[in-house]
């Protein structure tokens, strides 16, 4: 669910699952947006990860109160953005999947009060 060059876009109570990788392929992407807010959303098994903040025009974006289960490839991707706020989310992460994506993670991000739980397998079995 990706807005592009939007001002104050709001995404609430959505589900994104099983997206496939094509350079990115995450559930959510504040792509060059100003003030995008994602809250109370659910994502699972997206090959590109959970959320991306894309390019230097991606400013003042917030990702809060969301649940990510078994997203892959790196959960967060701050890609060239000057700021992003990620707070009070629940991330259920498979062993070996990094919190920050290995590629496209050269932006800035502030993390606050997020819950990260390691899971054993794709079915969500806890370790």
Q: Predicted regions span which residues?
A:
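Right-handed parallel beta-helix
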Residues: 2, 7-20, 26-27, 34-49, ...
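Solvent-exposed loop and edge beta-strand segments that line ligand/cofactor-binding
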Residues: 25-29, 51-54, 75-77
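Hydrophobic alpha-helical segments
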Residues: 58-59, 101
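C-terminal structured "cap/appendage" subdomains that terminate the fold
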Residues: 120, 125-127
């Amino acid at each position: 669910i990706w807005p592009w060059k939007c001002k104050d876009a709001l995404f609430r109570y959505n589900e994104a699952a099983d997206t496939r990788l094509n350079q990115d392929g995450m559930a959510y992407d504040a792509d060059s947006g100003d003030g995008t807010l994602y809250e109370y959303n659910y994502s699972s098994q997206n090959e590109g990860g959970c959320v991306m903040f894309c390019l230097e025009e991606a400013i003042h974006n917030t990702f809060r109160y969301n649940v990510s289960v078994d997203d892959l490839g790196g959960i967060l991707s701050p890609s060239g953005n000057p700021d992003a706020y990620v707070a009070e989310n629940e991330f259920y992460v498979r062993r070996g999947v990094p919190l920050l994506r290995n590629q496209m993670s050269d932006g800035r991000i502030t993390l606050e009060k997020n819950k990260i739980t390691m899971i054993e397998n794709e079915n969500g079995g806890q370790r």
